[in-house]
Every structure is written in C-alpha cells, then in structure tokens.
Amino acid sequence: MSGTTLLIHDLEAAVSPKGSGPLRGRDLGELEVCSPASIAVSGDRIAAVGPPGEVLRDHPPGPGCETVDGRGKAALPGLVDCHTHAAFLGDRADEFELRCRGAGYEEIHASGGGILSTVRATRAGSEEELRAATERHLDWLLRHGTTTAEVKSGYGLDREAELRLLRAIRAAGDAHPVDVRPTFLGAHTVPPEFSGAAEYVEFVVAEVLPEAAPLAEAADVFVERGSFEVPEARRYLEACAGYGLALRLHADQFSERGAVPLAVELGARSADHLESTGGEGVRALGQSATAAVLLPACALFLGLPDPPARALLEAGAIVALATDFNPGSSFCSSLPVVLNLACTRLGLSPAEALCAATANAAYVLGLEGEVGRLSAGYRADILLLDAPDWRYIAYHLGGDHLAAVVKSGGLLPPG
C-alpha cells in the first residue's frame, strides 16, 4: 500500500532554495526549479518532488490519498517569519497619526508612548484575551503564506505579565496551524517602575527568567539608547544562555551601540534590524554564524535608512527577512510585501528574497532541515500560487495569488 497521503500533480513549477542549511553571501538566491513538477506527501513530510511521471510512478496515490490539480500553479515552501511581536493587545493608531504629523518614534517612546503604550494595554489583559489576540494575528500571517512564525513576548515587562504572555503564545501555537516558536523578550525596554536598565535586568534574571525559560526557545534584547546598552545586554543574554535559550538581539536600529560585536561574540543566532550598521559590523557578520535579519517594512514604516543588504551579502553574511510585525513600528503581517521591499529597496533579487524568507529564516529559528525547502524529508509546508510566474509573490505588491496552503501535510481550508 502506498504511503502517499497527498499528491499535488502537474504543477507548472516547484521552486525551492538549493542544498541544506543557510545560504551565505552570494549563494543566496540559488534555487532548485523543477518544471513541470509533482509533489508527493506522506503524513506530515514531503516524500518526493520531481517530474510528474517519476513522482506518480514511485509514489502512487493509495486509498484515501487527497489529490490536488496543480495545473497553472507554482509551489513554494511555506514562508518562515523569524521576527514578530505578534502577542499584544491594543493598537497604536493614534501614534501612527502623530508620526504622520512629524513626531519621531524615539520622541514618542521617550514621552511614555511607543512600546510602553502597548505594555499598558497588554498588562491589563487576561491570558485568554492574549491567546485570542495572538491567534487572530497568526491568522493574518497565515493569510499571506506564513506557515512558521517566531513570536516574542516583551509587552509585559513584569513577572506575571511576561509569563502570561509566554503561556498565551504557546497556547496560541498549540491551537493554530502556524507553527509558533516563542522568544522571551524580557529586555525590550525599561518599565517605569524601575530606576534604570541595570536594576531591571537584575530583576528579570532573578525573578522572571527561571520561570520564563521553560516556556521559550530563545531570548532577545533591544540594544539601543533609551533601552539597554551592551553591559546590561551581556548580563541578560549570558543568563539566558545558561538556561539553554538561543540568543537574539535587536541591533543597530537607530544607532550603533556595540550590539553586533556582542552578538557575534556570544554566538547569537541573529542580529536583527541593522539599519545603522557600519562596515565593521557588516564584516563581523560576514565572518560569523550569526544571521543578519533584515526588516525592511519597519524601516519603511518609520522612515529609517534601509539596512545594508548588498554589503552584507558581499561580506558573506547569512541574510534573512522578516516582517517585525508589531503594533507600533511595523504593522505589517505580509511577508510577500517584505519580499517586494527587499527587492525594490534593498536590492535583492526575487530568488534572494525568497531564500531569505524560507531557508535562512528557518536557520534563525534552529529549524534548518525541518522547514524552508521543498525537499524530501522536510515538513510538508507548501504554498500554491495561482500566477503566471512564481516571482509574483515578490513582484505583485499587495497581490493575492495564494491559491492554497498545505500545512504539515494537510490542505488548509480557504481563508
């Protein structure tokens, strides 16, 4: 009896990053394109991708196998959003209007708005309200083809609220088709009840981290003026590493503060943002295993300089893309929009952008070999595009060409 449980047949093309592991530097954008193609799925895994005749011969559909007609469609790996703040309550529409009238993001933050505005709204919510809101935000991500997403805490900033957030993130992930990887962003900014960053970090390390660590897979810190400098970030990250958490850093968003050298020194999985990163930081990332996660929707939303994507690639860096979805500085839940911005503003090709939001984003989350490619043995997370060319996912700004989503081998219902 055949083990094939889903057969997607006669696709125009199946498109996937080449090889295994992250694609560095100029290798970003190396694709395997099979045209025409069929994909056989067994359970939650891809069994084969190849010419239709070969796939049908080697993986014939058995009793109960679901079949999908792929004619006129292209298959891509499910997108991986490796940097989101999707667990929050409230919004910051009023602040958006203030910025439209000329107020700066840092100015709003310094006056008690920004992150702290969302902290107040999030602290006031119940765990059930947070779970429901996170699931709603995951719906938005999935609608645009994201099948795996990192979700950070960081809008609680006290013991009970941070733990409540992490529990809500995990509960939302358990209930939702999108695979959720939780990150403890205990050092997002300093809440007003603390006198300074050093005092707050000691509180987090002593009172929050021991209970937060089992609920998370990674830890993150915002290294920036007005938030945390390198000494506090080092203290926090080294403590988190002691609990086995992978390390992430918000780095060089508004100014260079030494975050990139710290990320490389500590072997962090990623340094994210990098709008202000100079030549030394670019070279350091190019020689390291720390990925550069670029967030062009945030740069656009705040009117910041674009991160140095091509310089990072020329230096040999591992470049990934993400939405930075959050209510204040990047209210964007669409990775295809980010792919377009990566092409039009950062100078990436559509192939480079696709690889950065699949294989390399999977690497950031420690999921290389699991998601981000259409290859035998990988999880069967597959997007079907109804478009003349697979590049429409980046080319058509705001377009809606997603015909179907397969998640862990199951065809999801429309919408």
Curated annotation (Swiss-Prot):
Zn(2+) binds at residues 83, 85, 250, 324. N-formimidoyl-L-glutamate binds at residues 155, 326, 328. GO terms for cellular component: cytoplasm. 4-imidazolone-5-propanoate binds at residues 92, 155, 188, 253, 329. Pfam families: Amidohydro_1 (PF01979). One of its GO terms (molecular function) is imidazolonepropionase activity. InterPro entries: Amidohydro-rel, HutI, Metal-dep_hydrolase_composite, Metal_Hydrolase. It is found in: Cytoplasm. Catalyzes the hydrolytic cleavage of the carbon-nitrogen bond in imidazolone-5-propanoate to yield N-formimidoyl-L-glutamate. It is the third step in the universal histidine degradation pathway. Belongs to the metallo-dependent hydrolases superfamily. HutI family. PANTHER family: IMIDAZOLONEPROPIONASE, IMIDAZOLONEPROPIONASE-RELATED. This is Imidazolonepropionase.
